[in-house]
């Protein structure tokens, strides 16, 4: 405190001296010699600011000089994307600190430090930062993904893991997954548009497939087609939720509390959407399961994940609201991110026909005519490498879901202030040329040859963290990886995928990001030429 007070006095004296000189009634008649002192003061003011900043914050990670009230917001802007933060790490090092209004943001861009944040010091950095919009969409942390680290998170994670995220669940539902995927293949084979030169945008059909997979697991419910009114309503609600939550438009009010009143209209729009969205989930799905369970009484058997979750609620472990926020998490975290990765994978396969052929050859050689199933995916290393390479090059959550330290913490010898937002630049870890050969290339072989071989000898490769690791890692990895592998295998074995006539030889894989997410900027138009069975 004494040091800060002394710095403030020095700075005040400097400013007062400058003001006195410039406001003097004789200032208009300054001689050159009289101007020397004010010019000198003006010249050294930036250095005084830097000195004061470095003295008062000597143990904080390095970072650009911040301004009062705004911090670094005016310098870096709203879009704190993975590429900008990677570029800044080249200047400020593997861990640096940004001041965004009233909030601290620590950025980690090194595998060893990622290990510290996510694993070794996983408890210290295991919480989640607050956000004015995500507070609305999570009911102030009543969910599992964005809640703070503690007893509520442990309870929600346990309740969600049993019906969704275990090997037993994967084996239980894998036949259903394949059934939904085979319907996609059937529709593509029988739809004339898929094989025409102009191709089709496959995203909507894959979206229906993923919604059916997750809604059958969650509610034992299925959408009949892309024109099903409930499917249209569900996707519309979730799309609007993603748009509002991922937008950068509300950052100014989140970073600077003084400006928050100007967000009133935006936040009201979020509240209105969330109320209607949760009512939709409750009225059409959750209450339906409650009625079925009540009608069956003691004879009821657990059919789907929601039955298990309602059981937990009826036993007093979680509230009615918690039930709905579990549904919220699955709709966003499990469906949308997997869909983005499928789009990236298909685009890269179209742009790399050699990879398609290698997958096809591997499946034919290894399985000798047997179909690809979840149970034999482990026998197909090149297919698995293709999934890994897709997630490496196009990490769907490039900065992972942000972490937070509830108390002051140490990292790499630096002090991380209490309640700092801490992000790990997982995209840069997986695309830094210091650690990866030609990282901009889509080359699955890297995971079966030189780079993958070295990584395979360690338990966790902290250069490659598309799902995070440790306590707050994404539990959906156990579903996403086999689903991605099966979809790729079924498409490659049934079709030669090529670019549409208007595509000029390549699919555009430009990216578009939001607060956390990364997805392909333009949905791919693909020609599916059926392979004779």
UniProtKB/Swiss-Prot annotation:
Residue runs in coiled coils: none
Molecular function as annotated in GO: heme binding; iron ion binding; monooxygenase activity; oxidoreductase activity, acting on paired donors, with incorporation or reduction of molecular oxygen
Annotated membrane topology: Multi-pass membrane protein
Record field: transmembrane: 4-24, 35-55
Stored InterPro entries: Cyt_P450, Cyt_P450_CS, Cyt_P450_E_grp-I, Cyt_P450_sf
Residues annotated to bind heme: 474
Main location class: membrane
Induction: Up-regulated by methyl jasmonate (MeJA).
Cofactor: heme
Location(s) in or outside the cell: Membrane
GO cellular component: membrane
EC number(s) on file: 1.14.-.-
Keyword Oxidoreductase: yes
A Pfam match: p450
Keyword Oxidoreductase: yes
Keywords: Heme, Iron, Membrane, Metal-binding, Monooxygenase, Oxidoreductase, Transmembrane, Transmembrane helix
Role summary: Probable heme-thiolate monooxygenase.
UniProt similarity note: Belongs to the cytochrome P450 family.
Descriptive protein name: Cytochrome P450 CYP73A100
Species, as recorded: Panax ginseng (Korean ginseng)
């Amino acid at each position: 405190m004494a040091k800060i007070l002394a710095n403030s006095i020095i700075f005040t004296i400097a400013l007062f001296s400058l003001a006195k000189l410039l406001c003097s009634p004789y200032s208009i008649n300054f001689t050159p010699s009289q101007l020397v002192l004010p010019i000198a003061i003006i010249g050294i003011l930036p250095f005084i600011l830097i000195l004061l900043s470095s003295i008062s914050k000597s143990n904080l990670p390095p970072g650009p000089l911040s301004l009062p009230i705004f911090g670094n917001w005016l310098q870096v802007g709203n879009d704190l994307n993975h590429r900008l933060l990677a570029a800044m790490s080249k200047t400020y090092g593997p861990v640096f600190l940004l001041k965004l209004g009233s909030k601290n943001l620590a950025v980690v861009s090194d595998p060893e430090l990622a290990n510290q944040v996510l694993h070794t010091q996983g408890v210290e950095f295991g919480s989640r930062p607050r956000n004015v919009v995500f507070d609305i969409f999570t009911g102030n942390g009543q969910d599992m993904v964005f809640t703070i680290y503690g007893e509520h998170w442990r309870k929600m994670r346990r309740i969600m893991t049993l019906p969704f995220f275990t090997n037993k669940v994967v084996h239980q539902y894998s036949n259903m997954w394949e059934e939904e995927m085979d319907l996609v293949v059937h529709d593509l084979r029988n739809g004339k548009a898929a094989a025409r030169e102009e191709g089709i945008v496959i995203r909507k059909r894959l979206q229906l497939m993923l919604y059916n997979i997750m809604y059958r697991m969650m509610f034992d419910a299925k959408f009949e087609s892309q024109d099903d009114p409930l499917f249209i309503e569900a996707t519309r609600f979730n799309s609007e939720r993603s748009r509002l939550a991922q937008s950068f438009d509300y950052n100014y009010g989140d970073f600077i509390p003084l400006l928050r009143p100007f967000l009133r209209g935006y936040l009201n729009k979020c509240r209105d959407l969330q109320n209607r969205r949760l009512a939709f989930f409750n009225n059409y799905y959750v209450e339906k399961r409650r009625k079925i369970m009540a009608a069956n009484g003691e004879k009821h058997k657990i059919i789907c994940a929601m039955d298990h979750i309602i059981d937990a609620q009826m036993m007093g472990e979680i509230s009615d609201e918690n039930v709905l926020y579990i549904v919220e998490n699955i709709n966003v975290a499990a469906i949308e991110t997997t869909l983005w990765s499928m789009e990236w994978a298909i685009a890269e396969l179209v742009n790399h026909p050699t990879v398609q052929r290698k997958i096809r050859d591997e499946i034919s050689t290894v399985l000798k005519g047997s179909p690809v199933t979840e149970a034999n995916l482990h026998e197909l290393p090149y297919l698995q490498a293709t999934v890994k390479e897709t997630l490496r090059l196009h990490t769907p959550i490039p900065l992972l879901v942000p972490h937070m330290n509830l108390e002051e913490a140490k990292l790499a010898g630096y002090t991380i202030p209490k309640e700092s937002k801490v992000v790990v630049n997982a995209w840069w870890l997986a695309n830094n040329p210091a650690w990866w050969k030609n990282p901009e290339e889509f080359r699955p072989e890297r995971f079966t040859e030189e780079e993958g071989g070295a990584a395979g000898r360690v338990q966790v490769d902290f250069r490659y963290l598309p799902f995070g690791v440790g306590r707050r890692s994404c539990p959906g990895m156990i579903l996403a990886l086999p689903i991605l592998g099966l979809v790729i295998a079924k498409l490659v074995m049934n079709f030669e995928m090529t670019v549409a006539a208007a595509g000029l030889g390549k699919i555009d894989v430009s990216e578009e990001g939001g607060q956390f997410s990364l997805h392909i900027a333009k949905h791919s138009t693909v020609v599916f030429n059926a392979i004779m069975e």
